[in-house]
Amino acid sequence: MTAQTMQIGNRPCRIYGEAHAEYLLLQMTGEHELQSMDGEVAAIAQSAHHFLFAAIPVENWNDALSPWEAPAVWRKQGFGGKAADTLRFLTEQVVPSLKQQFDLPEKVKIILGGYSLAGLFALWASTQTNLFYGVAAASPSVWFPGWMEFEQQRPIQTPYIYLSLGDKEEHTKNTVMAAVGDSIHTLHSRLAERGTDCTLEWNSGGHFKDADLRTAKAFRWVMEEHT
């Protein structure tokens, strides 16, 4: 599937797929992910569903995708808490631009997904709006300080939720990140109790293994779950 670049706001977004698509897949991406994007989209395309996929770049990963400020937990960079600005850009610029440019149905099914902190952003965004049909959260950073308490007070509104984690991810020496296993179990149980259509899949390996294929699997599950 060939990519094209579309300028939205001041950002060069990488677009794959076709006009009139049933699904619109959105993923916030860092520079470190762009080289594997072709492979990820090829894996998503193993689904029979018609989709348009947009990779939307973020300048500062830790700032743009974090819902509130938090101190550094790994290396030295903390979190700037600018997710609300990122979500506003998605809802006010990206989605309307793509709908118009690619003649998408008014009620196109929008799936927000991503890996790591982008997965957490997708989950957080679904507590703020009911715009999204589904969330594809691969190895999401649910260890993020205050997230689990926040979600309990302001629950996710999205009907289809895919969660995954590498089976070695919780065995880190970083005490904050080591909570990821317990947190994702708790979140999955909460969602199931509320009647959300959700799954939790365990992948082999640590956090940095097969990020592109894990994310592709997440998007595919959400598209195929209702069929």
Which residue stretches match the model-derived regions?
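N-terminal cap/lid segment of alpha/beta-hydrolase-fold proteins
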Residues: 1-18
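The conserved beta1-alpha1 loop
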Residues: 26-30, 139, 165
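Short beta-strand immediately N-terminal to the catalytic nucleophile in serine-hydrolase-like folds
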Residues: 109-114, 138
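Gly/Ala-rich beta-loop-alpha elbow adjacent to hydrolase catalytic centers
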Residues: 113-118, 122
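Conserved hydrolase catalytic core segment
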Residues: 124-134
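The feature captures the conserved acid-bearing segment of alpha/beta-hydrolase catalytic domains
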Residues: 142-222
